[in-house]
């Protein structure tokens, strides 16, 4: 139980800006439990975002424009910009059109290139559009918590099932200890949390299933893409995946609300 709690705290330290003052020892047990706790951290992030949105929308007259912008930036801030940085590094490397080895070197470079700036602007512009249009047409507050939960659960699967691009870095450090069993535990935890959400608010179950299918599709596409373009999975690749899949899930919700109305 101590290892499980330490693993959860390690995930919170790594994936969020929530201050955890405790020094967590890095070992095989905490690393494995940290991967298993990815869905729990995703759910925690989702609850924070949902509660913030509820307060802003229920106790103020803030416009949908402000609500959409606040929700989008909160998701980036609470992760400490970690995933956004990964998206930018991957974009710089991909649009360099170099060989795999050179792309890996570019991802490790701390400098920000023009393509990184353009790609993050494009990503956030489209996400803002999807969030804003969804809020205008009616956003179910429970779905706000589903998106981070799905993205972090999927990140655990991509981390374990994707081929590591190199033997150093964050992804390699986790892969040294975690295996497919840990990915399966993360999936079970994620599914249980989704089931709890659907039990609390049953009317969203169709949308949740649709989003889960979209997430599974995104994992397979991302795995093929990163292995072909970068030789495998890195920490930056995982960060880019989280940013990309969250934008993709917001797009799916917008499409459902605009054309299917489930």
From Swiss-Prot:
GO-annotated cellular components: plasma membrane
GO biological process: cobalamin biosynthetic process
Pathway(s) served: Cofactor biosynthesis; adenosylcobalamin biosynthesis; adenosylcobalamin from cob(II)yrinate a,c-diamide: step 7/7
The protein's enzyme class: transferase
Catalytic activity, reaction form: alpha-ribazole + adenosylcob(III)inamide-GDP = adenosylcob(III)alamin + GMP + H(+); alpha-ribazole 5'-phosphate + adenosylcob(III)inamide-GDP = adenosylcob(III)alamin 5'-phosphate + GMP + H(+)
Its membrane topology: Multi-pass membrane protein
InterPro entries cross-referenced by the UniProt entry: CobS (IPR003805)
Keywords (A to Z) from UniProt: Cell membrane, Cobalamin biosynthesis, Magnesium, Membrane, Transferase, Transmembrane, Transmembrane helix
A GO molecular function held by the record: cobalamin 5'-phosphate synthase activity
E.C. designation(s): 2.7.8.26
Stored Pfam families: CobS
Compartments where found: Cell membrane
Entry superkingdom: Bacteria
Cofactor annotation: Mg(2+)
Membrane spanning stretches: 4-21, 37-57, 62-82, 112-132, 141-161, 181-201, 202-222, 236-256
PANTHER family listed in its UniProt record: ADENOSYLCOBINAMIDE-GDP RIBAZOLETRANSFERASE
Function noted in UniProt: Joins adenosylcobinamide-GDP and alpha-ribazole to generate adenosylcobalamin (Ado-cobalamin). Also synthesizes adenosylcobalamin 5'-phosphate from adenosylcobinamide-GDP and alpha-ribazole 5'-phosphate.
Family in the record: Belongs to the CobS family.
Official protein name in the record: Adenosylcobinamide-GDP ribazoletransferase
């Amino acid at each position: 139980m101590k290892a499980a709690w330490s693993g959860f705290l390690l995930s919170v330290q790594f994936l969020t800006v929530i201050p955890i003052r405790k020094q967590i020892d890095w070992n095989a047990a905490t690393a494995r439990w940290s991967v298993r706790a990815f869905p729990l951290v995703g759910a925690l992030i989702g609850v924070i975002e949902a509660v913030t949105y509820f307060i802003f929308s229920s106790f103020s007259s803030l416009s949908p424009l402000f609500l959409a912008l606040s929700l989008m930036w909160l998701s980036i801030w609470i992760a400490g910009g970690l995933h956004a940085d990964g998206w930018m590094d991957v974009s710089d490397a991909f649009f360099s059109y170099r060989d795999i080895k050179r792309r890996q070197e570019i991802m490790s470079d701390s400098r920000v290139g023009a393509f990184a700036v353009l790609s993050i602007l494009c990503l956030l512009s489209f996400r803002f559009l999807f969030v804003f249009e969804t809020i205008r047409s009616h956003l179910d507050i429970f779905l706000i918590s589903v998106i981070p939960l799905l993205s972090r659960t999927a990140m655990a699967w991509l981390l374990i099932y994707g081929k590591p691009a190199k033997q150093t870095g964050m992804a390699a450090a986790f892969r040294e200890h975690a295996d497919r069993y840990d990915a399966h535990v993360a999936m079970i935890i994620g599914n249980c949390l989704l089931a709890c959400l659907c039990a609390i608010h049953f009317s969203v179950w169709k949308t949740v299933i649709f989003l889960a299918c979209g997430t599974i599709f995104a994992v397979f596409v991302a795995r093929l893409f990163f292995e072909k373009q970068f030789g495998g999975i890195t920490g930056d690749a995982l960060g880019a995946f989280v940013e990309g899949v969250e934008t993709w899930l917001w797009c799916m919700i917008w499409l459902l609300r605009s054309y299917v109305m489930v």
